């Protein structure tokens, strides 16, 4: 249950965020980029509002989508670098108290080197995870260019949909977040399920190949 004082605090926070976003508007597309670069400013608010500005002719759809997508990479990159230069040393020193062994860190590194791009991509579609996923990518020292590319590829359609709906709903742009939230999680889960299926099939194919090679070598003797 949300008490009245908590409601007032939430309203105050929302008003503060909105005032910042309105201030960013004066910077045009660079303002959109900056707003998306700051992780605690929700993209679910910025992008539909920017779509509303597009509907009024203040900006263009293409410009907002590009600026928003680039900003959507800059923000995660900050967390990536925090994970890269602060996360691994911390876990190597204190991981034993969290029951995290060095071998587990090495396995994580290998996994992200092989599949980090897909993890960075699919994580953008999962509410609650999309912000945090950048940190383990950094801890595993995933290639920064690969991380940035996959994050950008994911942000392009996400940004477009939020902005486009903001354009269509106009003054009712605030409804965009609640409309899309119900779809983002199923999409993210579906993408992860396909990825796990791919890994399973790849592992099975590798095992079958090993068995065939073993039989071939055995018959050669």
UniProtKB/Swiss-Prot annotation:
**Record GO cellular component, one term:** plasma membrane
Does this UniProt record's set of keywords contain Membrane? Answer: yes
Q: How does it sit in the membrane?
A: Multi-pass membrane protein
Q: Which UniProt keywords apply?
A: Cell membrane, Membrane, Transmembrane, Transmembrane helix
Q: Which parts pass through the membrane?
A: 30-50, 62-82, 144-164, 179-199
What subcellular compartments does it reside in? Cell membrane
Similarity comment? Belongs to the DedA family.
Name under which the protein is recorded: Uncharacterized membrane protein YkoX
Specify the species: Bacillus subtilis (strain 168)
Q: Which gene encodes it?
A: ykoX
